[in-house]
Amino acid sequence: VERTQAEITGRGRSLTARMMAAAKLETAVYEEVEHDASATGQAAIVVGIVAVCAAIGSATGGAGEAFGAVVGAYLGWLVWAGVTYLIGDKLLGGTATWGELLRTLGFAQSPGVLYILGIIPLLGWLAVFAVWLWLLVAGIIAIRQALDFSTGKAVLTAVLGMLAYIVVALAIAAVVGVDVGMAAA
């Protein structure tokens, strides 16, 4: 059976198929969205879905808090991609654009839909912690694939980026009063 180029490269995959592949840590999907500029909108949808799932999973506030969490998730995503771009591309010699990092890091949040499990009494925190670890691994893969360098450099970029991200997030929270959301990182 012959396959089309779109089937081979994955272009044209549905949002759900891309999210599933990203959650399975399939490096091919990270390469795919890195090079597909039209996937930026899909990556933004992933960030929004994950933010809503996290808000439901935390079940601590009403609609206003959920709205703030979604806004914070988007700001966090933009900041995280920007900081990662500056460190990975400009300091450590990777090769990526900010848009490529936006897309790969957006899809790296795919496992975050399981943050909704945080609502489970007594065990929710454990599920949230496991999802956070999963997101960390997905983020490192996204960074590695987008910047086209080693896993070691991706880990270094993630660690340095996280430290810088925390400083920027705290500054934004202090000035604007919006929690930039650590789930985005």
Predicted regions located by residue number:
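Membrane-interface segments at transmembrane-helix boundaries
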Residues: M20-A23, T84-A108, G139-I140, R144-T151, ...
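Selected alpha-helical membrane-embedding segments in polytopic membrane proteins
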Residues: E2-T97
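Short, strongly hydrophobic alpha-helical membrane anchors
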Residues: G181-A185
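Hydrophobic alpha-helical transmembrane segments in multi-pass membrane proteins
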Residues: G41-Y85, R103-G139, L156-V180
